[in-house]
Amino acid sequence: FDLANYYSMHPVLLDEHFRSLPPIINYSNKEFYGGRIKVMRRNDNSKKVLETVVVPDGKVDFDATRNLPEIEALVKRLHEIVIEDERKNPDNPVSIGIISPFRAQVEQLKISVSKVLSEHMMEKHQIEIGTAHTFQGDERDIILISWAYANNSFPQSLIFLQKPNLFNVAITRARYQMINFISKDPRELPEGILRSYLGFVEEYENRFALS
C-alpha cells in the first residue's frame, strides 16, 4: 500500500524537523510522510552522513537472527569512531546509538561492544544498543544499524525488519551520521523498503564521491 498516504491519514508529526541533517531524513520524508516535513537543518557537505557497509562474509546463525561477522564489522567501526572522537573532540564527545531489528543480534552486540569499550567510554558517548523500540523518541549524533540480513536469511526475517513504523524509527534517529551494515548486496534484495532505502543511500554516496 501507499505508505505516504497511510501516514497522511494518520498525522503524528510536526511539520518542522530539527533533528537530522537533510540526507538522513529525506528518504523518510518522501516514503513515509509524503514530503510534508520541512527540514530545518542545512546540509554539511564536508562529511559523508549516509553510508552502507556490505559485509561479504556475513551469514546468520541457525535461528536466522544473529550475524556474527556483521557484528564484528560494526564493532570495529564503532571502535574507530570512538578513538577518532577521543583524539579530536575529548571534551564534547559524540553520542552513539546501535540498532538492530532482532533481539538476539542486539544482545550479542551488547556483549561484543562491552569487550571493546569500557563502561566509562560507553557512558561518555551515551552508547545505547537496542531495537527500534528502544530508540522511539530518542536520538544520537551517530547511529549504526545492523540489519543482520544475509544470503542465508529466512524470507520471514525481511518481512519482520521492514515493518513500516519500526523501520521509519530506525532510520531517523541520527543527527549527523547514519551507517548501515548488511551482509547481502542491497541490489540483490527483494523489492521492498529496505532495498529502496539502501538504494537511496547508494545514490547519496555516489553523489558525495563526485562532490
What are these regions (language model features)?
Residues 1-42, 101-103, 183-187:
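Conserved coupling/interface region of RecA-like P-loop/ASCE motor cores
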Residues 1-12, 29, 152-211:
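Helicase C-terminal subdomain and adjacent C-terminal extension
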Residues 6-11, 48-50, 125, 139-142, ...:
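Short glycine-/polar-rich loops that comprise or flank the Walker A/P-loop
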Residues 18-21, 25, 71, 75, ...:
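Amphipathic alpha-helical transducer elements in NTP-driven molecular machines
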Residues 35-114:
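Conserved helicase/translocase motor-coupling segment
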Residues 97, 114-131:
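Conserved RecA-like helicase motor-core motifs
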Residues 102-103, 129-135:
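Conserved helicase motor
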Residues 130, 138-150, 169, 177-180:
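A short beta-strand element within the Helicase C-terminal
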